Amino acid sequence: MAYQSSVKLRGLSLNCDIGSYGMNEVLPNKHRLDMELLVEKNLILIEEDKMANVFDYDPLVEDITQISLSGKFNTQEKLITLILKACLKYYQIKAVSLFLYKTPVREDGELGIAVSISEQELKKLREQLL
């Protein structure tokens, strides 16, 4: 099913320790997350202004924050995998796109990894992992 409604988060700074760097390499000072969570329209277009009628993203953001602080990561891939697993707990999320990136790369660039998980893939992951 194609969803045209989503919750988007852009540029969330994560205080995490990822990778190892040599003496002459530029150390990233920021790791950031962009996230798009596809949800049903009835969680976006509401009649009554009540939190019970929407997807409360604050607990997920807190989960992501705690994951990012949980220790040293060798790769961005491991961190994005754990973030995806955190998304699985929230059944209002029907599909998800994640982009985790670091800056600076070579003084002024950004570099990251992205993953998009469809509704069918998310359902299979939930069945396997939860």
Language-model segments: which ranges?
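N-terminal, polar/charged subdomain of small-to-medium soluble alpha/beta proteins
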Residues: M1-L130
